[in-house]
């Protein structure tokens, strides 16, 4: 168990129904926080008692996000942090086989979704001069992944977005950081070919995939009051794949 608590803290986690988002939500709750879980798939969250609040949200839709933010703020009154995790991987194939519709879906969820959800809470954070924005990016945003170029483009975009936004908010007590995990064994594997998965595993020097629990532990520290002097940073969880 970690040696700090998040008692009395309220967080929004997008893409909270499963995988990384669910693991982060669980860890925050274990540390005493209250979590509003945002996801399109409310059925997947129906059996999870860890959520204090749930919203069906399409993060790529401006009205859906703004309505959910208003309802969440009305419920909690104070939000201490947002974990922007919702994402899609998209098909694994070369760019010349991608349709514009497939490209747009990845960008709208993985990049525009981060903009919309973070913007919805920024004035609240600014009014209280405190907030933690954590974006779940990917090592693909630093190195690119052949077969998933739109995904890499979106994740590179959120890394640049986080660095710029972090500086815009200085010298406030609002921090903006990213996590950049290597491939993690979640339900997104269902969208990937076996050859793609094995090729990505071969690029991890530790010889295994990242776990959702490892990501959740890192996330809990980054969104805590203890992580108070770090902003605009990318925290890698890559098993040695990326060391920069």
Predicted feature descriptions by range:
Residues 2, 89-92, 143, 220, ...:
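Short C-terminal tail/terminal secondary-structure segment
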Residues 93-95, 102-107, 189, 200:
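Substrate-binding pocket helix/loop in short-chain dehydrogenase/reductase
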Residues 96, 143-149, 171-172, 207, ...:
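Active-site loop immediately N-terminal to the catalytic Tyr-X3-Lys motif
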Residues 98, 144-152, 164, 192:
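Active-site loop-to-helix junction immediately N-terminal to the catalytic Tyr of the SDR YXXXK motif
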Residues 118, 154, 162:
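Active-site helix of classical SDR
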Residues 123, 167-171, 228:
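Alpha-helical segment proximal to the catalytic Tyr-Lys
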Residues 138:
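Residue(s) in the substrate-gating loop at a strand-loop-helix junction
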């Amino acid at each position: 168990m970690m040696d700090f608590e998040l008692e009395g803290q309220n967080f929004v986690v997008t893409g909270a129904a499963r995988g990384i988002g669910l693991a982060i939500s669980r860890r925050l709750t274990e540390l005493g926080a209250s979590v509003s879980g945002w996801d399109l798939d409310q059925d997947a969250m129906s059996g999870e008692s860890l959520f204090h609040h749930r919203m069906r949200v399409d993060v790529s839709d401006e009205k859906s996000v703004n309505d959910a933010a208003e309802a969440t703020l009305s419920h909690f009154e104070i939000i201490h942090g947002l974990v922007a995790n919702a994402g899609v991987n998209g098909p694994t194939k070369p760019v010349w086989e991608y349709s514009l519709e497939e490209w747009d879906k990845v960008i709208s969820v993985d990049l525009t979704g981060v903009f919309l959800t973070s913007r919805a809470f920024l004035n609240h954070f600014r009014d209280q001069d405190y907030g933690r924005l954590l974006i779940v990016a990917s090592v693909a945003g630093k190195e690119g992944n052949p077969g998933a170029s739109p995904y890499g483009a979106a994740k590179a975009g959120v890394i640049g977005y986080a660095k710029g936004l972090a500086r815009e908010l200085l010298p406030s007590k609002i921090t903006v950081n990213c996590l950049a995990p290597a491939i993690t064994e979640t339900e997104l594997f269902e969208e990937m070919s076996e050859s793609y998965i094995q090729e990505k595993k071969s690029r991890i020097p530790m010889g295994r995939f990242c776990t959702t629990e490892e990501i959740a532990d890192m996330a809990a520290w980054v969104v805590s009051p203890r992580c108070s002097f770090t902003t605009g940073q990318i925290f890698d969880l890559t098993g040695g794949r990326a060391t920069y």
